[in-house]
Amino acid sequence: MSSGNGHVQSEVRFSYCMLPDYSMADSIEMIKVADELGYYACYSVDETWHKDLWCLFAAAADKTRNIRFGPNVTHVFLREPTLICQQLATLDELTGGRAEAVVSTGNFVMMEQYHLDWAKRKPLSRLREAMHVMRTFLDDGKIDFEGDFFRYTGLFTAARPVQARLPLKMGGMKGPRSFEVAGEIADGLHHALSYSREAYDYVIDHVKIGAQRAGRNWQELDLGAWIVSVVSDDSAAAKEAARILVAFYIPSMPPEQLARHGIDQSELQPMFDAFAAGDVAKAINMFGPELAEKLSVAGTPEECAEKIRTDILPSGINHIVLALADAPLVELFSGQSVSGVPGISDQLRLAAKRMIPAIVGQPSAA
């Protein structure tokens, strides 16, 4: 997991997922630091709320050597699958074969802002069909297809990946069917915003069901935990930053997922009501530290390592995706200031030097 000198080396992968809300120069610098430290990948969310990940990663391609790039997640309601493939293959060429993608139906809150009635449009069936379209188009560079959601006649592209097989993984939160489909057809599953042993046992149990149904070995899949993280020597400051930021993620979490953390969604309704009324400060204040502790990985490097080692890896997760947050990001979301929290580059260094080595010798379950 780490050589002990601050460079990441492990059978358990460690990656960084950014929210591209910083200046392009600052974002590229963060990516360069992650590359130099040996992180497996730099991912980014693919949402209208943030800057464009495809342009950012194209700009970072020739400034890095080993780190992989891709959306985590991109989505198949607001984006067309073959156009995602065109972007991926172009990025793969620019990076010399370092592109991949995690694909889902999309952020439900954002789709509501687009007035997309996604729930009545068979989202998982659409995603499954999109994964078939994308795999075909990436592998063959052309497609003829007549599906329930996507149709193509004689479509082709000059955008071809460098890799023999560009990895396509699925993103999922609620389950269980999305977890099973990922086990059946995808190169992996990345599960966002869970932090409990119960949640990850549930995820992996259903990935296994899908893999078994397809005659696949689930242990060969990339099984990621996408977690909001703040790493600092000032434990209280890290936890306060995480508390503020995580409050904004809660509305995206299905009730079933909250229940796997011992949280009844009805407990959070007053907070949701405050957000809906536009009273952000009140909503954040109603999200207490005890809830934030359940729904983030924050604290000293050693505290973060302990939570990952105890609650996440034992289920069989083999990829930790750190969605790191710092003071500028907290202020952007909430308007509130926090102190005692390092910038992203310094958090990447702290994690590589102390958090990841603290997990050495504790591989994910076989």
Regions found by a protein language model. Name each.
Residues 1-366:
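Active-site-adjacent structural elements that line small-molecule/cofactor binding pockets in enzymes
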